[in-house]
Amino acid sequence: MNFQRMTDLNLAGKRVLIREDLNVPVKNGVITSDARLRAALPTIKAALEKGAAVMVFSHLGRPVEGEPKPEQSLAPVAAYLTEALGQEVKLFTDYLDGVEVEAGQVVLLENVRFNPGEKKNNPELAQKYAALCDVFVMDAFGTAHRAEASTEGVARFAPVAAAGPLLAAELDALGRAMQTPEKPMVAIVAGSKVSTKLDVLNSLSGICDQLIVGGGIANTFLAAAGYNVGKSLYEADLVETAKQIAAKVSVPLPTDVVVADASQINFEDFLGSLAAAQAVIKKVEDVTANDMILDVGPETAKAFANILTTSKTILWNGPVGVFEVDQFGEGTKALSLAVAQSDAFSIAGGGDTLAAIDKYNVADQIGYISTGGGAFLEFVEGKTLPAVAVLLERA
């Protein structure tokens, strides 16, 4: 993908406006997870080292536009950045008519979603953002799938628009997996419903050599192959769709599964009741009417791990079982370790996937971990991300 990169630009003495994703969880004024802030720091530091006058902006939460509330302010983020950067990072609440910032200095602009017209990508607002800077840097991959004034609009009107290091790394990794994958390529797509991942499955079926499915998605494919899935979560209306996908790409199905007796499960307290449920390993052909499939069995996990070992590119989205409960997490654990130990280029994304990577402590062995969530899925679906499209146009 051809786009301008912040790292290639001369920023000395330039006013640089950086769109980061600083949408961190804040409870009673305290940031409870700083992962996104830690991810953004290298970009801010790089702009400072290049001699720029740096303005950073972001959204936080879902405020009503034009109705700022203190609990949705970026004030805790300004305090965090002040400490992390070793210089005062002032928070500007009134910035649309201009901001005073010197070269080598960083300021933070208040929550963009306080500004009427932000979410609707109002061109007048986008032009006001653009007028603040000489260079606009888009570095928030997690919001790149939304055409908003601070993501797509400003990039149209700024004198120069470039991708920051975080966004560039994300696009490079996704491009490597989706556009020029080294073969053989294997994708792991798991989740509760085929319907929510249908575009992902269709897109990947045209790219990868093997498609490993897990969770409720696998149950729908098992039902399509004529197996009884008992009380397991599956979508009867998508059995034909599963057959069509399986006709396009190799979908290795589980040969054994881990089940629980559905009568022992309280669906109001699903994970709590599962913790007390007995896990039973069964061949897929032995699943009975009252069984609920909650993981792949050890034989299947080993077979899937062997597929991953011989692949050159792995894209992973979703755990193959209810890994939050240990007795139904062995399949996800085995696949996590197989991805980690494979020599393939691996990219992983999606909230549950990241939680599994954390649980099994394999983050350092995954080629690239996408922080994008919805943006990651839309890219994998083959959709154009508006904030990326404008950078490509302006390159």
Swiss-Prot record:
Source organism, top-level taxon: Bacteria
Record-listed ATP binding positions: 197, 324, 350-353
InterPro entries referenced in this protein's UniProt entry, alphabetically: Phosphoglycerate_kinase, Phosphoglycerate_kinase_CS, Phosphoglycerate_kinase_N, Phosphoglycerate_kinase_sf
Residue numbers binding substrate: 21-23, 36, 59-62, 113, 146
Keywords: ATP-binding, Cytoplasm, Glycolysis, Kinase, Nucleotide-binding, Transferase
Enzyme class: transferase
A Pfam family per the record: PGK
Locations listed in the record: Cytoplasm
Record has Nucleotide-binding as a keyword: yes
Pathway(s) it belongs to: Carbohydrate degradation; glycolysis; pyruvate from D-glyceraldehyde 3-phosphate: step 2/5
Chief localization: cytoplasm
GO cellular component term of the entry, any: cytosol
The protein's Enzyme Commission number: 2.7.2.3
Gene Ontology terms, MF aspect: ADP binding; ATP binding; phosphoglycerate kinase activity
GO process annotations (BP): gluconeogenesis; glycolytic process
Matches recorded under HAMAP family: Phosphoglyc_kinase (MF_00145)
PANTHER family xrefs: PHOSPHOGLYCERATE KINASE (PTHR11406), PHOSPHOGLYCERATE KINASE 1, CHLOROPLASTIC-RELATED (PTHR11406:SF23)
The family this protein is said to belong to: Belongs to the phosphoglycerate kinase family.
Quaternary structure and partners: Monomer.
Protein name in UniProt: Phosphoglycerate kinase
Origin organism lineage: Bacteria, Pseudomonadati, Pseudomonadota, Gammaproteobacteria, Moraxellales
